[in-house]
Amino acid sequence: MSGLTHFDAAGHAHMVDVGGKQETQRIAIARGTIRMLPATFALIRDGKAKKGDVLGVARIAAIQGAKRTAELIPLCHPLALTRVAVDFELDDALPGVHCVAQVETFGRTGVEMEALTAVQVGLLTVYDMCKAVDRGMVITEVSVREKRGGKSGDWKAEDTAG
């Protein structure tokens, strides 16, 4: 792995120059989990949360988060995203909810940060909508699971099947 790219020789932070990079299809998939009490899980599963459709609102928030990543992370390039897909999986065994975001663009830099931001914002929205009944929810295991495209090529997390 190469050195840190967001610092110059003097150690000052800067936005990486991607002007000379080739435009390619870029895809990143991120995943995260929010663990909660069984009663909170039941409210989400049964659609009975007082604030409304928890996962529907969280999906829209996650998409918005991906689109606004460059406003939140100082050295991220603003990107024209071509696709943001967000899915939630209810997990009775935790109990909790998994969030998976896939973000795509055709450009000169990757979309890993956008995928991570989508997952975090989606899970934060679940927390916000359910905190009145469960302040002990825990957001955990947020990570990039896969990335495709660009000079460094494709990558999958080692524990990712397939």
UniProtKB/Swiss-Prot annotation:
Q: Name one GO molecular function term.
A: cyclic pyranopterin monophosphate synthase activity
Top-rank taxon:
Bacteria
Reactions listed under catalytic activity:
(8S)-3',8-cyclo-7,8-dihydroguanosine 5'-triphosphate = cyclic pyranopterin phosphate + diphosphate
- Active-site residues, as the UniProt record annotates them: D128
Top EC class per UniProt?
lyase
Binding-site list for substrate = L75, C76, H77, M113, E114
- Describe which pathway this protein belongs to, using the record's wording: Cofactor biosynthesis; molybdopterin biosynthesis
Keywords from UniProt, A to Z, are: Lyase, Molybdenum cofactor biosynthesis
Does the keyword section mention Lyase?
yes
Query: EC number(s) on record?
Result: 4.6.1.17
> Entry's Gene3D superfamilies?
Molybdopterin cofactor biosynthesis C (MoaC) domain (3.30.70.640)
Query: Could you tell me which InterPro entries the record lists for this protein?
Result: MoaC, MoaC_bact/euk, MoaC_sf, MoCo_biosynth_MoaA/MoaC, Mopterin_CF_biosynth-C_dom
In its UniProt record, which GO terms are filed under biological process? Mo-molybdopterin cofactor biosynthetic process
Which family is it part of? Answer: Belongs to the MoaC family.
What function does this protein fulfil?
Answer: Catalyzes the conversion of (8S)-3',8-cyclo-7,8-dihydroguanosine 5'-triphosphate to cyclic pyranopterin monophosphate (cPMP).
Instruction: List, alphabetically, the PANTHER family matched.
Output: CYCLIC PYRANOPTERIN MONOPHOSPHATE SYNTHASE, MOLYBDOPTERIN COFACTOR SYNTHESIS PROTEIN A
Assembly with partners or alone? Homohexamer; trimer of dimers.
Name of the protein this chain belongs to? Cyclic pyranopterin monophosphate synthase
Q: Which species is the source of this protein?
A: Burkholderia ambifaria (strain MC40-6)
